[in-house]
Structure formats: structure tokens, C-alpha cells
Regions:
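Compositionally biased terminal segments of proteins
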Residues: 1-166
């Protein structure tokens, strides 16, 4: 089965877009195939507050036939650096939708961490030929209630809870 996010990730790579897959969908890549994965309805991509990078991300989405939204309205045109700068100033989320109920959020914030810090610790995964960068072991997105996921060796990831509420 092909991952629905793979075509977009290939288009992002072609444009040298910097992003990290975070949230529940990101945590699922650390789980061994024989284990059950967490259910989620979307993919969360964390991007740096860089207008040119955001513009390239939008172009990659359009190239793969995806629609761009700001809340419940189509993202305005022209989609240029000026619009990207406005989105960054407001830390606005771009919602991306596509076939088969594909939903991707292009987020410019991750509570408690800045992009450059997380980017330095990234760990790539290869899914359907697409490299998908993710936060490295020990970095967890506080946007979700998931436990932090830590790699103990190359082939043996484990889940480590950080609070008693989980």
C-alpha cells in the first residue's frame, strides 16, 4: 500500500522544502510494523518561519494536485512571498486537502520548540521512495498527548511515556 503523503514529500524534496513530520502521524513511523499504530486523520508538517520555504511548500502542494486552505476559505492568490510573509507574521496554518480525504497541516509553530533546534536532530524515514524528515529521538511534539518516542537501537524503537497521565 502506498502512503498518501509520499507524493507530496517527493515534491517537497524536489523543491528543497525544509519540514518535519510531527504529531500522531510522525510517531507512527517509529512503531514497528507488527505493532498497532495510532489512528489519525491528518499529517502535520512543521515548517520554519521562512517565506521562501513556505512558498516552495505551497508550490509542491499545487504540483501534486492538492488544494490549499486558510481556515474554511481557499488560500488567497497570488501565492507569493508577500502572502507567505503575512501567513508567517500571523503564524497561520495552511490546511492542504486532496483525494481520499488526505489532510495535511503546514504548521509554523510547535509549542516549546523552535524549528532550527528540532531540525538539527531530525531523523529521515524512507516511505515509498520519499524521504520524510522527523524530529530525532528524544524530541516529542507537545502539541499532542502522545508519549515521546525513543530509538534504543537501529532496529528496536520503543515507546517511553513522560507522564503518568498516559
Amino acid at each position: 500500500m502506498t502512503s498518501p503523503i509520499a507524493p507530496l514529500c517527493r515534491a517537497l524534496a524536489e523543491r528543497s522544502v525544509r519540514y518535519l513530520l510531527i504529531g500522531v502521524s510522525g510517531a507512527n513511523f517509529y512503531i514497528p510494523p507488527s505493532w498497532p499504530s495510532f489512528v489519525t486523520l491528518d499529517y502535520d508538517l512543521y515548517l520554519p518561519p521562512d517565506a521562501n520555504n513556505l512558498l516552495r511548500a505551497w508550490e509542491a502542494c499545487e504540483q501534486t494536485g492538492l488544494d490549499l486552505w486558510l481556515r474554511d476559505e481557499p488560500l488567497d492568490r497570488p501565492r507569493d512571498v508577500g502572502l507567505a510573509e503575512q501567513m508567517i507574521a500571523r503564524l497561520a496554518l495552511t490546511r492542504v486537502t486532496g483525494p481520499d480525504d488526505l489532510t495535511v497541516d503546514l504548521a509554523l509553530v510547535m509549542k516549546g520548540l523552535d524549528f532550527e533546534t528540532v531540525w538539527k536532530e531530525r531523523r529521515p524515514f524512507i516511505i515509498d521512495g520519499a524521504e520524510i524528515p522527523q524530529p530525532g529521538s528524544g524530541i516529542s511534539s507537545s502539541r499532542s498527548t502522545l508519549p515521546a518516542v525513543t530509538r534504543t537501537s537501529c532496529f528496536s524503537p520503543r515507546i517511553e511515556t513522560r507522564s503518568s497521565s498516559w
